[in-house]
Amino acid sequence: KTTIRRDSKVRQLSKGMVAQLHLALVMAIDARLLVLDEPTLGLDILYRKQFYDSLLNDYYDRSRTIIVTTHQVEEIQNVLTDVMFIDRGRIVFNCSMEDFESRYVEVMVNPEQAAAARALKPMHERPALGRSILLFDLASEHGANSKFDRQQLSALGEVHTPSIADLFVAVMSNQRTTTGAAR
């Protein structure tokens, strides 16, 4: 769905309209595997949302696979079946969304609970309005087989599933710290 007229010249279109045209052409292809690299780059939020809605409702069916690379993970998080992070050509993270939702937990703690939360060895920590948000991997060596779980973490503060963007920051920060130390 677009507002581009049939008699429009490509050279007269805005960058966003050229992107809309390109995406319409891509979606017209009947392919079992569709690879989209930053498909909504240059589109405003309204057209990005419409594109993903069309992609899922008009294009996708169970016989097709769609691979999307994007820096705007938050706009597609709710439609993903799997997530993968790549750093310098190497896969550094790969899991299903089902595993993601059961495995990763963020806890927002007050300063009084911060030391107890840190003792559980989170994979990442960031400050937030005078409190700390700690991200845990419940399947890590300190997680699934350890002495804490999601319910026990809730005694330390507010517990929720992290966004993919927050997990990305944690994984990449740890990756860069590890590879930087190895050099």
Give names to the regions the model predicted.
Residues 129-183:
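C-terminal coupling/interaction segments
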Residues 26, 112, 173:
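Residue-level marker of positions within ordered structural domains that often coincide
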Residues 34-39, 114-117, 141-146:
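Short, surface-exposed beta-strand/loop "edge" segments at domain boundaries and coil↔beta transitions
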Residues 1-87, 93:
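ABC transporter nucleotide-binding domains
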Residues 4, 91, 105, 155-158:
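Short N-terminal micro-motifs specific to bacterial/archaeal maturation
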Residues 52-141:
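ABC transporter nucleotide-binding domain
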Residues 22, 32, 105, 173-177:
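Generic structural signal for secondary-structure transition and capping sites
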